Amino acid sequence: MDRRKWVQWLFEAKTRYGLVILNYAVTSNHIHLLVLDEKGRDVIPDSIKLVAGRTAQEYNLRKKRKGAFWEDRYHATAIESERHLLACLVYIDLNMVRTGVVSHPSEWPFGGYNEIQKPRRKCVLIAYQKLAELTGFKTYDAFRKAHKEWVSESLANGDNFRQAQWTQSIAVGSKSFIETIKEKLGILAKGRKIIENEGEFQLREDMRGAYNANFDIEIGDIGGQNAYYWDVYHGNSCT
């Protein structure tokens, strides 16, 4: 029920703020959300506060309880388009397969895979054409077919392990992309390392600090006012 409520409030965030949603997965103990920041710096933090806040409020009312609902911080990563975005997309799709709950992402109802494969006419969450455009495809149908193949190949190859770049990086992409992000962050990026792995580059966060459950900034994080990288970069992001 709480997962379904979270998805409903995600749709409300899209309606209210114009949040551009590329993929998502609501698991048993955490959430992945892949979005595009193209409408201004307040859209993503406002949307997250709405979804998280209302979900927590409704849960507490239903359970007649008080106190924190979200017990852990959320982490945000800026992602370069095309192949890096594709990798993140599939990583999110396979989340519940990684945990052993399902054998295929189509079996999990609280994620974007099924909508990506079977676009809706009503209550649409995923920005279909934008997703195709950002991944380098001319048509959504071409993207959809390729997306299905990527997931199938990952499952067949056993390429379904946890990848630290999505949970411990400020940004993921090409070397030039990462250097641009670091340069724009200026002094805020001091001490953050650029790491290369098989042609993919990451700007790593200092994990001593991050967002807490109430969306405040803890000591050690580079952020401010619920947003760090979208102050300097408007693009794809995964939380």
PLM regions with names:
Residues H32-L33:
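N-terminal functional module of multi-domain proteins
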